[in-house]
UniProtKB/Swiss-Prot annotation:
Entry's Gene Ontology cellular component terms: chloroplast
Note on cofactor: Binds 3 Mg(2+) or Mn(2+) ions per subunit.
Intracellular or extracellular location(s): Plastid, Chloroplast
Protein name in the entry: Alpha-thujene synthase TPS3, chloroplastic
Binding site for Mg(2+) 3: D476, T480, E484
One example GO MF annotation: alpha-thujene synthase activity
Swiss-Prot/TrEMBL cofactor(s): Mg(2+); Mn(2+)
EC number assigned by the record: 4.2.3.-, 4.2.3.110
Organismal lineage: Eukaryota, Viridiplantae, Streptophyta, Embryophyta, Tracheophyta
Gene name in the database record: TPS3
């Protein structure tokens, strides 16, 4: 389903109605309010998710401080960057050049060397004699992965050379652990219908799980890491942290690269800390966490989500916008899923659809402050887009919020009526209700460049948003559906398939994992950008899917985070690399 833009008809001019509000005033098209404390006398009959308080309080955020000061290392960092650029020119061997590009990217340094990486890949893509031999499995697989990852048109037919006369991959390949690992990673960038890559994935995963003998410990570590989750599915900033530590263990590491990666990670971490402090103050001033006690207060978790989706340091404004959106989505989701009655939710959905401050008059007290927070924050975001890029984005932002609330109300009606949707019916609504289109839509207009509206209706863009959101939804369902159904929520994808196909939960879970694989294939086809300016959105779409795997890999990392989730937050936001 393509996102359709509304005809711009929204006006910032409204006649406010201060009904039952203590204070109401406009500030730059924004309404600030304090509402009388909501009554909880009607708690009887309302559901509860029993969410625990966040592991992170404002004191943790405000005391975040890194000893690392980039200004103290500026000249050294410039020298290291010069060393790396010189190295990229010095290396002549095509395989070594590709390995260097791969290492730079995995260390989290790709954004610093975009121009140089593009030059290398252009040379490789246009050279008909990149390799004198096509028998090097590692080289062929690495070339395929890098080119496809960067949007070049590349065929997987080269892998047929590694098959025997019976049509299967040669058993002799099992001795080449490095090549097998490269093929395994490359297989996760497949498109639908690329059977050879499906076969490659099955072949490599089976044999890599069974490796034994005297194997290089660093290579073995990489194999186990990839089998746990392939690189293409991993949250890239956490992956950079892991790879920096792993690269340190390699005998052939380049000292300049290793040093630069640590300095860059620490430098970017200080940017994240500054942004998180600003977001924490915004959330505290907004007051929703205190007013709506039934909802999840997950500001740090939302910021962690955001850094996974938009991690390049230059997109600080976009991270701020997306953090606000993520926390509002989390709150409104709890209004629909946990607290609101069907009658109240119908009113709230109508109010969002109208996008008029007067629509608040019909809402109960707890919804007024929620609606006003949504209205104000969205208008603030739109004001920045108008001021910085000259774009009136209100019609589009209103559209994605309305679509989200309408998808929520569909699920609320299903729950109220005891209706069990088919899997297809559920997913057609659920890829919207997971809020991926809201997140990516806001991100698109916050990258700091003038983005054309019509690009959001390109088939490639619509497909990216849908399949990224679908992966998000299915990963969420695998981790959270049991708890949500136990508290009386609408059946999720697992339960829908169980009812429809008459299978066990275990079989249904395997089917959902299969759907995730298929969604990745469809999304991989979006790697080729129709226009260059869409690249930040393409990156964000893929990173949204990666964050879904990260957050829901070991349970509900958003609603009920565990010690592993806590450790990940600390690694990304609080623990810099130490220098001797």
């Amino acid at each position: 389903m393509a996102l359709q833009l509304l005809t711009p008809s929204f006006s910032f001019q409204h006649s406010p109605s201060p009904h039952r509000l203590t204070t109401l005033r406009y500030t730059h098209h924004t309404i600030r309010c304090t509402a009388s404390a909501p009554s909880y006398s009607d708690l009887v009959g309302r559901r509860s998710a029993n969410y625990k308080p966040s592991k992170w309080d404002s004191n943790f955020v405000e005391t975040l401080e890194s000893d690392y000061k980039k200004e103290n290392h500026e000249m050294y960092i410039e020298k290291l960057m010069g060393d790396v650029k010189h190295l990229m020119k010095k290396v002549v061997n095509p395989i070594e050049k590709m390995e260097l590009v791969d290492t730079i990217q995995r260390l989290g340094l790709g954004y610093l060397f975009n121009k140089e990486i593009k030059e290398v890949l252009n040379t490789i893509a246009t050279s008909k004699a990149t390799f004198k031999t096509k028998k090097d499995l590692h080289a062929v697989a690495l070339q395929f992965r890098l080119l496809r990852q960067h949007g070049y048109e590349v065929s997987p037919d080269a892998f047929h050379k590694f098959k025997d006369e019976k049509g299967g991959f040669k058993e002799s390949l099992c001795m080449d652990i490095k090549g097998m690992l490269s093929l395994y990673e490359a297989s996760h960038l497949s498109f639908q219908g690329e059977v050879v890559l499906d076969e490659a994935r099955e072949f490599t995963s089976t044999h890599l799980k069974a490796i034994e003998g005297n194997i290089d410990p660093v290579l073995l570590k990489k194999v186990r890491h990839s089998l746990e989750m392939p690189l293409h599915w991993r949250m890239l900033r956490l992956e950079a942290r892991w790879y920096i530590e792993t690269y340190d263990e390699e005998d052939r590491k380049n000292p300049s690269l290793a040093e630069l990666a640590k300095h860059d990670f620490n430098s970017v971490q200080t940017i994240y800390q500054r942004s998180l402090k600003r977001m924490s103050r915004w959330w505290r001033d907004l007051g929703l966490g205190e007013r709506l006690e039934f909802s999840r207060d997950r500001l740090v978790e939302c910021f962690f989500w955001t850094t996974g989706v938009i991690f390049d340091p230059q997109f600080e404004r976009c991270r701020g916008v997306l953090t606000k959106v993520n926390q509002l989505v989390s709150t409104i989701d709890d209004v629909y899923d946990v607290y609101g009655s069907l009658e109240e939710l119908e009113l709230f959905t109508d109010a969002v659809d109208r996008w008029d401050i007067r629509a608040m008059e019909q809402l109960p007290e707890y919804m007024k402050i929620c609606y006003l927070a949504l209205y104000n924050t969205t208008n603030d975001i739109a004001y920045e887009a108008l001021k910085e890029e000259g774009l009136d984005v209100i019609p589009y932002l209103k559209k994605v919020w309305t679509d989200l609330c309408k998808s929520y109300i569909v699920e609320a009606r299903w729950y109220s009526n005891g209706y069990k949707p088919t899997l297809e019916e559920y997913l057609e609504n659920a890829w919207t209700s997971i809020a991926g289109p809201v997140a990516l839509g806001h991100a698109y207009f916050s990258f700091g460049q003038k983005m054309p509206f019509e690009a959001l209706n390109y088939s490639n863009t619509s497909s990216l948003i849908k399949w990224s959101s679908m992966i998000f939804r299915l990963c969420d369902d695998l981790a959270t559906s049991s708890d949500e159904v136990a508290r009386g929520d609408v059946p999720k994808s697992i339960q829908c398939y169980m009812y429809e196909a008459g299978v066990s939960e275990s079989v249904a879970r395997d089917h959902i994992k299969y759907l995730i694989d298929e969604a990745w294939k469809k999304m991989n086809e979006c790697l080729v950008p129709s226009t260059p300016f869409l690249q930040p959105l393409i990156n964000a779409g893929f990173n949204l899917a990666r964050m879904a795997h990260c957050m829901y890999e070991h349970g509900d990392g958003h609603g009920f985070s565990n010690e592993l989730d806590k450790k990940r937050v600390l690694l990304l936001l609080a623990e810099p690399f130490k220098f001797m």
